[in-house]
């Protein structure tokens, strides 16, 4: 059995060792992704749409 870390290294075997992404690279990319999503939500501010769509139940019209 191989460890998950060893199995994950196989994804980037085709790259030279110097070009392979390190764990800090992946952490940085995830951090920037969170920052980008947070910034997009702050700019768009779709709170009314989200409340109407997911939180409030619409009354059925007869």
Curated annotation (Swiss-Prot):
Q: How is it placed in the membrane, per its record?
A: Single-pass membrane protein
Task: Topology check: give the Mitochondrial intermembrane ranges.
Answer: 45-62
Q: Report which superkingdom the organism of origin falls in.
A: Eukaryota
Keyword Membrane (UniProt): yes
Positions on the Mitochondrial matrix side per record topology? 2-25
Keyword Protein biosynthesis applies: no
Q: Where are the transmembrane segments?
A: 26-44
Q: Which UniProt keywords apply?
A: Electron transport, Membrane, Mitochondrion, Mitochondrion inner membrane, Respiratory chain, Transmembrane, Transmembrane helix, Transport
Where in the cell? Mitochondrion inner membrane
Record text on subunit structure and interactions: Component of the ubiquinol-cytochrome c oxidoreductase (cytochrome b-c1 complex, complex III, CIII), a multisubunit enzyme composed of 3 respiratory subunits cytochrome b, cytochrome c1 and Rieske protein, 2 core protein subunits, and additional low-molecular weight protein subunits. The complex exists as an obligatory dimer and forms supercomplexes (SCs) in the inner mitochondrial membrane with cytochrome c oxidase (complex IV, CIV).
- Belongs to which family? Belongs to the UQCR11/QCR10 family.
Functionally, this protein is described as follows: Component of the ubiquinol-cytochrome c oxidoreductase, a multisubunit transmembrane complex that is part of the mitochondrial electron transport chain which drives oxidative phosphorylation.
Name of the protein in question: Ubiquinol-cytochrome c reductase complex 6.7 kDa protein
What's the source species for this entry?
Solanum tuberosum (Potato)
């Amino acid at each position: 059995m191989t460890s998950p870390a060893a199995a994950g290294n196989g994804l980037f075997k085709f790259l030279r060792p110097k070009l392979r992404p390190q764990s800090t690279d992946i952490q940085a990319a995830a951090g920037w992704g969170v920052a980008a999503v947070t910034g997009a939500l702050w700019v768009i501010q779709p709170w009314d749409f989200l409340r109407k769509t997911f939180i409030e139940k619409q009354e059925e019209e007869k």
